[in-house]
Amino acid sequence: MATPTNKEHFSGGLAKVLAEKWQVDVMLKAKNSDEGSAISAHKLILASRSEVFKNMFELDEFKTSTKHVETITLSEMKHEELEAFVEFICSDGSMLSANVKQHARSLYLAADKYEILHLRDLCRTELISSLSLLNSLDLLVLAQIPFDKVLNDESFSYIKNNISTIASSDEFKLFVAGNPNLAVEIMKVSLITLTLRCSSCGSNHSLQGMYCCNCCRYGTLRLI
């Protein structure tokens, strides 16, 4: 078994303190868990990562000198998501673990709510890398609350490039019903980039593209 380096000892220090439940002074509970499964945490660490937590702990109810350890319910997260959230907070923040990546969508929202901008950036990168036919519409909606230009543009671009498949899916029908304005924007962009094929030379053209040769002016352009 490899011996941890000094750097690994240093970067893993907070996680070690958390795992040992040393000097725990606050408990975090998810919406779907009971008191017995609350997660141990430390106010100082949470406050150092998040201004929202810092402001929360400055309230009188948390300043009262007592041996009682307060339990805070973070209702926007499930238990396994909260575990991943605390895991990241106690990490060196250099990258997302496999466990945190698994919950990138929910942690993206949590990072925005608790103003942990570095976590939000990492989750955004993970979400963009995972763009697919199955989740592109969902990520486009996610990018609106609050508006995230990078995620919005990447999602739009993916949808535009795969519009023929996405537009024929049941998911798109539901998307149109729930997000009519976004659906209109998608169709506007998609119409501009529709591809046509010349029956004369076989070349492809966009609707706004130039003819590649004279024969294209006489060939029939067909949608592909």
Curated annotation (Swiss-Prot):
May act as a substrate-specific adapter of an E3 ubiquitin-protein ligase complex (CUL3-RBX1-BTB) which mediates the ubiquitination and subsequent proteasomal degradation of target proteins. This is BTB/POZ domain-containing protein At5g48510. Keywords: Ubl conjugation pathway. The BTB/POZ-like domain may mediate the interaction with some component of ubiquitin ligase complexes. Residues 24-98 form the BTB domain. InterPro entries: At1g01640-like (IPR044784), BTB/POZ_dom (IPR000210), SKP1/BTB/POZ_sf (IPR011333). It comes from Arabidopsis thaliana (Mouse-ear cress). The keyword 4Fe-4S does not apply. The keyword Transmembrane helix does not apply.
